[in-house]
A protein has these predicted regions:
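The feature marks the mature, well-folded catalytic cores of soluble enzymes
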Residues: 1-205
Length: 205
């Protein structure tokens, strides 16, 4: 990774701020900020916005109430195709606003209904069940994935590396791509690590 930025200390952030996908997404036109559902993270977007603007990243917009959206529900499949998880943390109004903000450069929006799972507090996002590692490679937990979405991924030529139940419970499906086929994964999940390495990925844990 050629450049890493650290968010400065700010009283609007907390321990959960390490999950930097959640309060915003950066697009080619600027950042979109999301109001976090967890009260303790409600002002996190403000700290992120202030810092990103200070380093020259413009603001495209923000999802406003009653819209709800979190970055963990937004997965880019390519530059013009985005999948959005519709669940406890992202609602229809939030999706509508995101469509409006990105309509000039996104051609296809795929809304993916999310299961209730273990309940709202479990915070199940779309990125809990799919992590893109390259344009044609993803780590997935198919058990929580709608059939139409899984079929769509396969039709796009994306190879799916399946996480089993045991490693899913250890966050094995949460993989961060640093570059195509270069990723950061949680240690203690040897099977999905081996699957990634079998596809030529460099895996850091």
């Amino acid at each position: 990774v050629p450049e890493v930025h650290y968010l400065p200390e700010d009283d609007r952030t907390g321990l959960d701020s390490i999950y930097t996908h959640d309060p915003l997404k950066v697009t080619k036109k600027g950042a979109v900020y999301f109001p976090m559902g967890k009260p303790l993270r409600g002002r996190e977007w403000m700290a992120s916005k202030a810092y990103l603007e200070s380093i020259g990243i413009p603001t495209l917009g923000r999802i406003e109430a009653p819209g709800k959206m979190e970055g963990g529900d937004v997965v880019w499949l390519d530059e013009r195709t985005v999948a959005i998880g519709r669940g406890d943390r992202t609602n229809d109004e939030g999706i509508r606003q995101f469509r409006e903000l990105t309509k000039d450069f996104v051609e296809r929006f795929i809304v993916v209904p999310m299961p209730h799972g273990e309940g709202e507090d479990a915070c199940l996002h779309l990125m809990s069940v799919i992590s893109m590692v390259d344009r044609d490679l993803a780590v997935v937990y198919s058990k929580f994935m709608p059939v139409f979405f899984r079929e769509l991924l396969l039709e796009r030529g994306i190879r799916l590396l399946e996480v089993d139940d045991e490693e899913y419970e250890r966050l094995g499906s949460n993989v961060l791509a640093l570059a195509p086929r270069v990723c950061l994964a949680l240690g203690g999940n040897p099977r999905i690590k081996a699957s990634l390495e079998g596809e030529g990925c460099k895996v850091y844990t």
